[in-house]
C-alpha cells in the first residue's frame, strides 16, 4: 500500500486525460470562435464593414440564389466546430493539405461546399443582433457583379449608391486575378490554367496580400526576407550553407577514415598515405553518422527547393506592393519598410465609418488595421518579449546541479534552443498565438506537470543528440577560426557578449537588427572598460614574456635572412627547425603583447563604464556608487567573455544541459505557468501579448512599471508593485529606445536648429568627451552626468532636465509624433510632463553626443519665454490645453475611435485614471488647489504656467 502511494505521487492518475489532449481539444474548440478566443485575429471578411443585420440579409439572399461567394464561405468557416462526421468530406477522408505558405489559408474559402446548415448564423455575429436600432436592410444582391464576365462567381452586394461605392471600393482590392476558367480561387494553378501566367503580377501580389489570414507569420516572413537582403542573397546563403555543411562532413570523414597516419613520416606523396576504399572499411558508428548527415543534407535541400515559391511571393510583395526592388532591400531601412506597409494598409481600407465603435469593440476589425510600428514589433517579437521578461525577472532556474558549480548559471545557444522547444512551443500554437488555456488558473497543476515532463524528455533527447552536435561544431569551429588565429594570434584573447548578456541587454519590442546594431557599437567601449582596471602583476609578466620571446624570434629571423638556405633547415632541437621555433616565439610574443595595454591609455574605469552603459542600457541597481570597483568589473566580465571560453562553454553545455533540464528547470515550472498567466494582456486585433511589451503611449512614463531604488523609499517597497514591475528600468529603457528608433518625425519649432561641430572623442582620453572643461574631476556619480539605475537612456533621456539637448537642434522635452505610429499610439506630452516633475534634477547623457561645455547654455537664434523651471511656457500651455488627452496628437482625427481599447468595458476606469493624472500634474491640490494657484498667479501678474 505504501509503495502504491509513493508511485501515485509521481505518476499521473489513471483515467485522467493528458494535458496535450486537453490543449488540442481547447485549440480545436476555439479555432472558429470569436475574437476573444482567436486572440483578436478575426477572419478577414470582405463585408465586415457592414452591420450584423446587413450581413445576415446578404448571406440569406446569397443562399436563396445559390451563390457561393468568398464572404459566404468565410462566414461559414466562422461557425462553431461541428462533429467529426459532419466535417469530413463526402468520401470520408480528410481534405488534402495545401502547399501554400503558412500565412495563407490552408484552403481557399471557396473550396468549402454548402450544406443544409449554412443558414445558421455564426455565434460571433449574434452580439447585440436582437437590437432594433439596426433598421437598414439590403435589397437582393445583383445577379452578376461583372456583366462582362458571366462565368465569374458574383458576390452579394448592395444596390444603394453609398453602400455600393464602398462595396466596389472594397472589391477592387480583393478581386481575384482573372482566368480563362470559372474554377474557384483555391483551385487555380498555373499548370492547369496556362492563362494565369499572363496575369499582371501586381494583381496577383495584391490578391495574395488581401487573402493573408495569419498576419504574424506573414510579417515574420517579410522581416526575415528583409534581414536576408532579398531573394538572391537568401538563395546564395542557403546554397553556401549546404556546401559548407557538406564540406565539413566530407572533409572530417576524409581526415578520420581515409588517411593512414603511421605512414606520414616515411612517405613523400599523398597517394602513399591514402587508405584504399576507405568508405567501405569505415566503422559502424562512422557509417551511421555519415548516413545521418547525408539524409539531413538531402532533407534541407528539398526544403529549400520547395521554399523558392514562397520567396518568389515575398519578392513580388516587396517589388509590386512596397515598391522595393531586390537591390534596394540591402540598403533600405526597416523604418521605411514599416511606413510602406502602413501606406499599403491605408490604401486597402477594411473598416467603414458606418459601423459604430460599440460594434467594433465586440466584433473586432480587420487585423491588418493594427499594423503600425508598435503592432508590427509586438507581432514579430511575441515570443521574444516573453523571453526578455523571463530573463529580466529571473524566473528561469539555470543553475548547474553540481556541487562545486551551484552558483554558476548555464545559458548557452543549446539551452536557448531547449527553452524554445520546451516552453515556447508548449505555450504557443502553430499560428504563433498564446494558447488561452494557459490563462486559466484551473489548469495550472496539469500544465505545470506537463511542462515538467517536457523538461525531462528534452534532457533525455539531448543525450542522444549531443554527440553529433559536438563533433560537427568542433570541426566547424576549427576550420573557421584556426587560420584566423594563426594569422593574428592576438585574436585569441578577443571577447564577445554571452547569450545571457544578449537577453539581458535586449529591450522589449527591439527587433534583432536594431539590437545588433546597438550592441556592435558598444564593443570598443566594452573592450576599453575591461582593459581599464589595474592588472599590474599581469602586465609586468606579459611585458617580460613579450621581451624574451621577441628577442629570440628576432635573432632567429635575422639569422634566416642572412643565410636562408642554410639556416631554415637547421634543427635547434631534434626534428624541430628554425621555422618551427619562429612560429612558436612569434605566437607567444603576439599573445603577451595583447595582454599589455597601450602606454598612452588613461585609467578611468568609471568613465569607460558610463560610456558603455549608453549603448548597453544595462545598469543594475547594485552598481550604483561602485562603478570603479573590481566587483562590478567581475560581474560585467561574466557577460563579456573571451570567444574561446564561450566556445568551450557551448561544448560543455551539451554535456551539462540534460542535468539542468532534469533537476533545475522543473523546479520553476509552476512559476513559468504563473508568469504567462499573470503577465499577459489581450490587445484587440493583435492578440495576447506580454504586458511589458504593450507600451501605454497615452500616459507616457506615468504608468510604466519600474523597480528601482530611486523610485520610492526602499523601506516602503510595495511587494505587489515590484512583482508586476521590471527590474533595472527595463521597461522604461525599452519605451525610450522604441521612440528613438521609430520617432523620426520631430516637432516643428520656431527656433532655427543649431548644429554644433562633430564630437570626435578618442578611446584613450576622457577629456575629449566633455570633461576637459571641468576644473576638477568630481568623484560622485551625479556630477558626472551619469545615468541612474532605472532611468532612461539615449536621446529621449534628456526629457526632464533643465537644459535641452544641444545636439540635433530639436527639443526632446516631450516626444514628437511619429508617422510610423497610429494616432492611438502617439506619445502623450501629459505623461512626460509628470515624469519630468518626478525627477527634475536627473541629468542623463545621450549616446549620440555630449556637450563640450556643460556650463554653457544652448545657442538659440530666437529667444522664447521660459518658465521658472526652465521649460518652454508655450509648450507647457499647449499641453495644458490638451488636458489629459490620452491618445496624443491626432486622436480626434482617428477613424479607429476607441475600437482598439485593450478592455472595451473599462471606459469609466480610464476616465478615472485620467482624472488622477490631472491631480498629479497640478501638484495634488485638486480643484481648490488649482483655483488658489490661479488667483495667486493673477495677483503676482505672471503670465507663465501655474503648474498645469
Curated annotation (Swiss-Prot):
Residues 1-20, 46-104, 130-193, 762-923 are annotated as: Disordered. InterPro entries: Autophagy-rel_prot_9 (IPR007241). Keywords: Autophagy, Cytoplasmic vesicle, Endoplasmic reticulum, Golgi apparatus, Lipid transport, Membrane, Phosphoprotein, Transmembrane, Transmembrane helix, Transport. It is found in: Preautophagosomal structure membrane; Cytoplasmic vesicle membrane; Golgi apparatus membrane; Endoplasmic reticulum membrane. It comes from the Eukaryota. It is a multi-pass membrane protein. GO terms for biological process: autophagy of mitochondrion; lipid transport; piecemeal microautophagy of the nucleus; protein localization to phagophore assembly site; reticulophagy. Residues 878-892 have a biased composition (Low complexity). The chain crosses the membrane at residues 231-251, 288-308, 544-564, 577-597. Residues 1-230, 309-454, 476-543, 598-643, 665-948 are cytoplasmic. Residues 66-79 have a biased composition (Polar residues). Disulfide bonds: none annotated. Residues 844-853 have a biased composition (Basic residues). Residues 163-172 have a biased composition (Basic and acidic residues). Residues 252-287, 565-576 are lumenal. It catalyses: a 1,2-diacyl-sn-glycero-3-phosphocholine(in) = a 1,2-diacyl-sn-glycero-3-phosphocholine(out); a 1,2-diacyl-sn-glycero-3-phospho-L-serine(in) = a 1,2-diacyl-sn-glycero-3-phospho-L-serine(out); a 1,2-diacyl-sn-glycero-3-phosphoethanolamine(in) = a 1,2-diacyl-sn-glycero-3-phosphoethanolamine(out); a 1,2-diacyl-sn-glycero-3-phospho-(1D-myo-inositol-3-phosphate)(in) = a 1,2-diacyl-sn-glycero-3-phospho-(1D-myo-inositol-3-phosphate)(out). The keyword rRNA-binding does not apply. One of its GO terms (cellular component) is endoplasmic reticulum membrane. Residues 455-475, 644-664 dip into the membrane without crossing it. The keyword Cytoplasm does not apply. Residues 907-917 have a biased composition (Acidic residues). Coiled coil: none annotated. Belongs to the ATG9 family. Homotrimer; forms a homotrimer with a central pore that forms a path between the two membrane leaflets. Phospholipid scramblase involved in autophagy and cytoplasm to vacuole transport (Cvt) vesicle formation. Cycles between the preautophagosomal structure/phagophore assembly site (PAS) and the cytoplasmic vesicle pool and supplies membrane for the growing autophagosome. Lipid scramblase activity plays a key role in preautophagosomal structure/phagophore assembly by distributing the phospholipids that arrive through atg2 from the cytoplasmic to the luminal leaflet of the bilayer, thereby driving autophagosomal membrane expansion. Required for mitophagy. This is Autophagy-related protein 9. The gene is atg9.
